[in-house]
């Protein structure tokens, strides 16, 4: 699940956090929110939260392992997410909605059927977290979502900094 790269005539698919995987995560969120549409910025934040749901008190275990300084992931997801949305849009699984306040993305009537045939452990966990995410944050305002991110982004992944300090003290 990731970006396809040509390498000396061969095709290589980067398995993690490429357009295919990030687009699939966005599709799961949009499907759970259907028929509501979300902005790209909201989807960037939601992608972070679905991957690192354990950063939210009371959230389910994260879809991916925790990494140091993971809060910075928010800065690099936008472009890849756009590519993923375009990929799924080209298959009529996501649609762009143009409104007075901007461009939004929504699932289509085909999205649920597509997701239903994907039965891997990863997709099952993804869909569970998408339901939790939309249920917990789907209706909060963009301003409140942005405030939550600003208030906590410095904490997300910071536990590794403390862990490395403690480990350094033990070895001395």
How does the language model describe each region?
Residues 101-108:
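Minor-groove-contacting beta-hairpin "wing" of winged helix-turn-helix DNA-binding domains
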Residues 110-142, 156-163:
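Short, amphipathic alpha-helical interaction segments positioned at domain boundaries
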Residues 152-172:
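C-terminal regulatory/oligomerization modules of transcriptional regulators
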Residues 2-72:
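Short, amphipathic alpha-helical interface elements at domain boundaries
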Residues 74-90:
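Short amphipathic alpha-helical interaction segments
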Residues 30-33, 49-50, 88, 118, ...:
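Generic structural signal for hydrophobic core residues of well-folded globular domains
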Residues 143-147:
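Non-catalytic interaction/clamp surfaces of large macromolecular machines
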Residues 89-99:
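A short, conserved structural fragment
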């Amino acid at each position: 699940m990731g970006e396809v790269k040509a390498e000396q005539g061969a095709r290589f698919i980067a398995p993690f956090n490429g357009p295919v995987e990030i687009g699939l995560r966005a599709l799961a969120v949009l499907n759970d929110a259907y028929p509501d549409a979300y902005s790209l910025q909201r989807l960037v934040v939601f992608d972070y939260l679905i991957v690192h749901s354990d950063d939210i008190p009371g959230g389910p275990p994260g879809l991916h392992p925790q990494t140091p300084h993971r809060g910075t992931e928010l800065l690099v997801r936008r472009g890849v997410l756009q590519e993923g949305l375009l990929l799924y849009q080209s298959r009529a699984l996501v649609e762009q909605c143009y409104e007075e306040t901007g461009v939004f993305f929504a699932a289509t009537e085909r999205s649920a059927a597509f997701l239903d045939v994907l039965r891997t452990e990863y997709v099952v966990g993804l869909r569970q977290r998408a339901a939790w995410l939309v249920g917990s944050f789907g209706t909060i305002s963009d301003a409140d979502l942005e405030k939550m991110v600003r208030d906590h982004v410095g904490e997300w992944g910071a536990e590794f900094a403390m862990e490395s300090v403690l480990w350094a003290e033990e070895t001395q």
